């Protein structure tokens, strides 16, 4: 057997083997799939799924790839078994109606035994129990003894794309780690002896709704070899984690924890392996444009980061560490996946932010969880699990994981009940979609052709009305005063897409005038939304469609400016920045992008100046339609998550910008005129937003600001350049006045509190005072409590106030002997009392404050405090 091939060498030998057999080597697709039915790329065949389903014609008959994949369905097994992962690379060779079963099997055997030099006597294969053809090929053509060919059922060895559609049997090759055990006890489920490393899928049937199988005219091959598994075999290590693909990450985590991996106990090794696996996942997910969030693939990323952080704490790593292990993962991958190095800054910033946030979450919730674990013997209640989730940010999966480590379960049904209660309490209005329009369009699409778009070259056109809708329902005709949706056979109107809003304009005919305010499209049908100002519109009418040229000019200026903005951000701020969304309207533009931090004033100024320089340089805009792969090879920027056909439209401003885009644009950057950034803000974790204006809108924006400046000058009797100094002076005056007011409030509170001394009760050797001081603020309340405790001597003071509607402030002040002799602590005590008022808090043993949101419970809270302290001080 070949000795110690590196993971990189294994990958390259696989690709080279099939390239020599006329397979086109394709780069790995993004982890963000084009298939909307899955969150992440989970298999090597996923990018080719449209071909296998007959939805797309292949550009070549054979392909080979090394596809990065992420699966989290077995996340609880990661680190606990030898070969479960969330991130892995799937090596594959594919045939689209070209070679089939016999050739696929022959090449798989040749690759395994002659390229990777696996001893034939150590290989076992499986076939679908009804696939006699595959069985015969393995036995008669390859020469494998029949007893080493295992027949398996449909669950294990039959691939389906869904309830109906292409499907077929598969055959798997296993490596035998212990051939000395003999052939009489072959059990492929025994993963301590056998590891499946190569799967061959023979797509040869179509399954109909009744379950009947019909042979396909074009049969396909889909194979997958696990890179990590082959590395384990060839590098002769105990598990995938100890291969050179992962172990350097594990070793770095062990170094940070001051642990010797080889001497570590099994529990510690599990944590180290989890870190090694998950860090690979999160690095590649962020590199492919995914940001942590509470939904969809963003939540998968957040969950994986949090598991890394928690397992780091379990093995004794203090503070933030994840970027250190991420650096190793980046170094291991950059030669094959260059975007991990290109987006290193973004990756580290996202990891640092999420790690810091989760460390705060852990610190807040771990004490409560510890107390829950102490009192519960078998199960954490749904109420407690929901409190951890809702109040402390603990995901249910994390609570379940920790509970499992302690031998407990979690009442998930109870958790879901609490979640539903909260949703009912906080139910808010949601935007709804008018499905009546969609339903009508679905029916229309069966009878009318997609609209022909003319708007790239024509601003007006003669067209035929193919449908009229009123209130979402198709009608034969509609009269003046009616809000309508009109469908045409051809149109110059741009329909909203790619962030650019739809055109405005008019539809005219014999005594007909329809003012169009918006245009949308669905399934290639353009819907013109408007109001009939004059006349009657009828299906079949010939009309003239004319867009508002002024609105179009402004929209295309803003759209081209958006392209310039992205280029400037990449050039001046971070080359790894990518678009996360946009809006191009007639009067302004909005651009959302991945960036872990706010832009500085200097950066914003540089970006603005660069864009205006490009505008002044009068660059021509070149538009071309080409193949998607050709466009990418030329460097055209594509938006993550956007679906593109085989033919794409490329907007090229030479030496400045090149993007895939279906929108409308200026012919020369000089047409934009001017560009002005209005604001830069954060809209989500790791997502920033720039709003800007271009062209005539810049003058309108500056005039508006000029009016504000003039008004301020009149108000303060100063010149424009003197306004900042005048505002600073006013702020200083206001701050001084507020300090004086606070001092007066505090003095009043102290005077009022002194009058309470006579209300103090004697409890044995101690004094106890529990009282409410009206609406004074928290700072004054704290000062009053501290002063009263000093005047009372040994004892306890509890003060409360309601400084605002439904807002409660509470303070506890305990003397030294109350703390020492009675074992009471102000922080813990007042925090518990505050829960009655739907709040919390804490502080030092002698002085602490808390707050609450339910003022109606204040009397109950004070009564509880008095009762408990009376009992404790006796």
Curated annotation (Swiss-Prot):
The lineage of its organism: Bacteria, Bacillati, Cyanobacteriota, Cyanophyceae, Oscillatoriophycideae. It is found in: Cytoplasm. This is Alanine--tRNA ligase. It holds the Pfam family tRNA-synt_2c. PROSITE patterns: AA_TRNA_LIGASE_II_ALA. One of its GO terms (biological process) is alanyl-tRNA aminoacylation. Its EC number is 6.1.1.7. The keyword Ligase applies. Disulfide bonds: none annotated. Zn(2+) binds at residues 559, 563, 661, 665. Keywords: Aminoacyl-tRNA synthetase, ATP-binding, Cytoplasm, Ligase, Metal-binding, Nucleotide-binding, Protein biosynthesis, RNA-binding, tRNA-binding, Zinc. Gene3D superfamilies: 2.40.30.130, 3.10.310.40, 3.30.54.20, 6.10.250.550, Bira Bifunctional Protein, Domain 2, Threonyl-trna Synthetase, Chain A, domain 2. InterPro entries: aa-tRNA-synth_II/BPL/LPL, Ala-tRNA-lgiase_IIc, Ala-tRNA-ligase_IIc_anticod-bd, Ala-tRNA-synth_IIc_core, Ala-tRNA-synth_IIc_N, Ala-tRNA_ligase, Ala_tRNA_ligase_euk/bac, DHHA1_dom. Catalyzes the attachment of alanine to tRNA(Ala) in a two-step reaction: alanine is first activated by ATP to form Ala-AMP and then transferred to the acceptor end of tRNA(Ala). Also edits incorrectly charged Ser-tRNA(Ala) and Gly-tRNA(Ala) via its editing domain. Binds 1 zinc ion per subunit. It comes from the Bacteria. The keyword Ligase applies. It catalyses: tRNA(Ala) + L-alanine + ATP = L-alanyl-tRNA(Ala) + AMP + diphosphate. GO terms for cellular component: cytosol. GO terms for molecular function: alanine-tRNA ligase activity; aminoacyl-tRNA deacylase activity; ATP binding; tRNA binding; zinc ion binding. Belongs to the class-II aminoacyl-tRNA synthetase family. Consists of three domains; the N-terminal catalytic domain, the editing domain and the C-terminal C-Ala domain. The editing domain removes incorrectly charged amino acids, while the C-Ala domain, along with tRNA(Ala), serves as a bridge to cooperatively bring together the editing and aminoacylation centers thus stimulating deacylation of misacylated tRNAs. Its cofactor is Zn(2+). It is an enzyme of class 6 (ligase).
């Amino acid at each position: 057997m070949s000795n110690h091939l590196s993971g990189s060498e294994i990958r390259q030998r696989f690709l080279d083997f099939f390239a020599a057999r006329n397979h086109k080597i394709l780069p790995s697709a993004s982890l963000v799939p084009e298939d909307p039915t899955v969150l992440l790329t989970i298999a090597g065949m996923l990018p080719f799924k449209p071909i296998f389903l007959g939805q797309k014609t292949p550009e070549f008959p054979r392909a080979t790839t090394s596809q990065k994949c992420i699966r989290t369905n077995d996340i609880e097994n990661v680190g606990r078994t030898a070969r479960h992962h969330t991130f892995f690379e799937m090596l594959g060779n594919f045939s689209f109606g070209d070679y089939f079963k016999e050739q696929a099997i022959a090449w798989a055997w040749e690759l395994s035994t002659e390229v990777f030099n696996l001893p034939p006597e150590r290989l076992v294969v499986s076939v679908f129990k009804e696939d006699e053809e595959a069985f015969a090929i393995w036995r008669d053509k390859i020469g494998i003894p029949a007893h080493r060919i295992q027949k398996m059922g449909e669950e294990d060895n039959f691939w389906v794309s869904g309830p109906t559609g292409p499907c077929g049997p598969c055959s798997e090759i296993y490596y035998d780690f212990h051939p000395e055990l003999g052939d009489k006890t072959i059990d492929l489920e025994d993963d301590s002896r056998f590891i499946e490393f190569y799967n061959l899928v023979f797509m040869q049937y179509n399954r109909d709704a009744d379950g009947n199988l019909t042979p396909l005219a074009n049969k396909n091959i889909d194979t997958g070899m696990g890179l990590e598994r082959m590395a384990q075999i060839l590098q002769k290590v105990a598990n995938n984690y100890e291969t050179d693909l992962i172990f350097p990450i594990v070793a770095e985590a062990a170094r940070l924890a001051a642990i010797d991996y080889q001497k570590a106990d099994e529990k510690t090794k599990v944590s180290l392996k989890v870190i090694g696996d998950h860090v690979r996942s999160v690095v590649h997910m962020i590199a492919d444009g995914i940001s942590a969030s509470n939904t969809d693939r963003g939540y998968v990323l957040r969950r994986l980061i949090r598991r890394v952080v928690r397992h780091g704490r379990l093995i004794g790593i203090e503070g933030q560490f994840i970027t250190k292990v991420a650096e190793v993962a980046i170094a291991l991958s950059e030669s094959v996946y260059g975007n991990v190095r290109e987006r290193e800054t973004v990756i580290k910033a996202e990891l640092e932010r999420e790690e810091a946030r989760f460390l705060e979450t852990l610190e807040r919730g771990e004490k409560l969880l510890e107390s829950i674990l102490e009192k519960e013997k078998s199960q954490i209640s749904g109420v407690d699990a929901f409190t951890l989730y809702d109040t402390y940010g603990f995901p249910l999966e994390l609570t379940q994981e920790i509970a499992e480590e302690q031998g407990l379960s979690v009442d998930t049904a109870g958790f879901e009940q609490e979640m539903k209660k909260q949703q009912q309490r906080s139910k808010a209005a949601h935007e709804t979609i008018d499905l009546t329009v969609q339903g009508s369009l679905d029916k229309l699409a069966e009878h009318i052709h997609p609209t022909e778009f003319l708007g790239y070259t024509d601003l007006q056109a003669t067209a035929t009305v193919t449908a009229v809708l009123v209130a979402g329902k198709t009608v034969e005709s509609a009269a003046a005063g009616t809000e309508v949706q009109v469908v045409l056979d051809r149109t110059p109107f741009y329909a909203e897409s790619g962030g650019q809003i739809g055109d405005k304009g008019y539809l005219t005919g014999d005594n007909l005038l329809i003012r169009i305010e918006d245009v949308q499209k669905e399934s290639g049908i353009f819907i013109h939304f408007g109001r009939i100002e004059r006349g009657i519109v009828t299906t079949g009418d010939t009309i003239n469609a004319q867009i508002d040229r002024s609105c179009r000019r402004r929209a295309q200026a803003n759209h081209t400016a958006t392209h310039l903005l992205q280029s400037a951000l990449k050039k001046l701020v971070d080359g790894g920045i990518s678009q996360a969304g946009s809006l191009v309207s007639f009067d302004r533009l909005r651009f959302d992008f991945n960036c872990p931090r706010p832009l500085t004033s200097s950066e914003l100024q540089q970006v603005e100046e660069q864009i205006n320089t490009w505008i002044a340089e009068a660059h021509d805009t070149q538009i071309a339609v080409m193949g998607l792969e050709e466009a990418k090879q030329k460097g055209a920027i594509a938006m993550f998550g956007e679906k593109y056909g085989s033919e794409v439209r490329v907007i090229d401003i030479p030496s400045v910008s090149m993007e895939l885009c279906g929108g409308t644009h200026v012919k020369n950057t000089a047409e934009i005129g001017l560009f002005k950034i209005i604001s830069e803000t954060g809209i989500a974790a790791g997502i920033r937003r720039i709003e800007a204006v271009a062209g005539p809108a810049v003058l309108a924006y500056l005039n508006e600001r000029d009016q504000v400046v003039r008004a301020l000058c009149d108000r303060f009797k100063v010149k424009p350049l003197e306004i900042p100094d005048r505002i600073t002076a006013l702020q200083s005056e206001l701050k001084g006045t507020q300090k004086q007011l606070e001092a007066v409030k505090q003095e009043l509170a102290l005077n009022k509190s002194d009058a309470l001394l006579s209300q103090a009760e004697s409890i044995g050797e101690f004094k106890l005072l529990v009282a409410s001081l009206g609406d004074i603020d928290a700072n004054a309340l704290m000062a009053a409590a501290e002063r009263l405790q000093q005047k009372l001597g040994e004892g306890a003071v509890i003060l409360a106030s309601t400084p605002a509607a439904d807002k409660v402030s509470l303070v506890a002040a305990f003397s030294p002997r109350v703390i020492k002799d009675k074992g009471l602590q102000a922080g813990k005590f007042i925090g518990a009392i505050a829960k009655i008022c739907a709040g919390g808090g804490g502080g030092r043993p002698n002085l602490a404050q808390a707050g609450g949101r339910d003022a109606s419970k204040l009397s109950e809270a004070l009564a509880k405090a008095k009762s408990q302290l009376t009992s404790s001080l006796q």
